[in-house]
Design a protein with these regions (language model features):
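Bacterial N-terminal signal peptides
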Residues: 3-16
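Small/flexible residues
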Residues: 11-12, 20, 71-72, 81, ...
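Generic N-terminal leader/processing signal
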Residues: 16, 67-68, 121-122
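General secondary-structure edge motif
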Residues: 16-18, 133
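N-terminal "mature-domain start" segment
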Residues: 19-58, 94-96, 127, 137, ...
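Short, solvent-exposed recognition patches
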Residues: 34, 38, 42-115
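A short, solvent-exposed beta-edge/loop patch
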Residues: 87-157
């Protein structure tokens, strides 16, 4: 095969990778202010894009801390999802979550206050995202809230 043909095939392959990559998503578009407020049981401020792949909804007039009532959604990737499903650190355990998109798993860290210790990793097709609910001391309640929000977010993908 000539070097021109090889170069053409490489360019074609590299150029088409973008077509098969996970779609870029705006994390703030996955939930509405009303959906988040209904799940948290309180009014929340409009979505605030913290970073290109991170969006946060928080209750007004609260200190900016991990204990404040808020929701964060992060656009993730297959690698992070794989680590959540099969943790390599013994202080983190994976708990299967059913009825959410194509697949989902809770990542729960031990030795961390409830709220910041639970994250819900979700997969739908080639898209991945993570839901975090903060500010509630009951872990099972946090997990239920994360599930409700994840199911709602899945409908937007």
């Amino acid at each position: 095969m000539s070097s021109v043909a090889i170069a053409f095939l490489c360019a074609l392959t590299l150029g088409s990778l973008r077509a098969y990559a996970a779609p870029d998503s705006d994390p703030c578009s996955l939930l509405t202010q009303q959906q988040v407020g209904a799940v948290l049981g309180t009014n929340v401020e409009a979505a605030h894009r913290i970073a290109p792949k991170l969006c946060e909804w928080s209750t007004p007039s609260q200190p900016n801390s991990m204990n404040a009532k808020k929701v964060a959604i992060t656009i993730s990737n297959e690698r992070a999802y794989g680590f959540a499903k099969t943790p390599i650190v013994q202080d983190i355990k994976a708990i299967a979550a059913s009825g959410i998109c194509d697949d989902a798993v809770y990542s729960v860290a031990s030795g961390v206050p409830v709220g910041p210790n639970t994250s819900l990793y979700v997969k739908k097709g080639a898209s991945y995202f993570v839901v975090h609910v903060y500010g509630f001391p009951d872990q099972s309640k946090v997990m239920g809230m994360e599930k409700t929000l994840a199911v709602q977010a899945c409908s937007k993908l």
